Amino acid sequence: MTETPQVPPRRLLIALGSLVLILMVGGAVSFVRYARRHAPQPGLIAVAPFDIFAVGLDRWRVGLATALSERLNAPPLAAVPQTVVAATWRSAPRPEISAVELARQTGAGLAVYARVDSLPGKPDSVRVSLLAIDATTTKVLFGVLLRWPAADPEGLAARLAEHVRHNHPVRTFPP
């Protein structure tokens, strides 16, 4: 005697198919909600600690980042608090990449990385380089290169904030 394979009843197949469909739709909805909640905020800026390569200006490392964050933290922009930056920051051989990772971890749409270098033969001045990087695409949106008096870190923070506000994709005032 040969046995014929049992074919499941049609209702059972419909029920299993419906269950699979419901689970797929539920997973898709869950993913979309998660992605929307964790999308970078375009008006949020993560200012990484400055790299300081100028003798005697080590105090600027966090101080400049804090001052710049405070000046950028006004509508329509917002800055990630430096306490959060300190807890999240992970240095790497390429600090601009670390700045982008900082922005991604904090939900910021823009990463700001800057460095301060000594100028040969000019002990009273420094060269400041700033990069603003889109955290989603990792594209450099703009850069700033300044020569600045070493005795004026507050003025430097104000000037850099002005550059960031003026060039940020979320326009803060007409061009």
Predicted regions and their residues:
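Short beta-strand->alpha-helix linker/helix-N-cap micro-motif
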Residues: 40-126, 134-148
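C-terminal/domain-edge helix-coil "capping" segments
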Residues: 2-20, 26-43, 121-125, 136-175
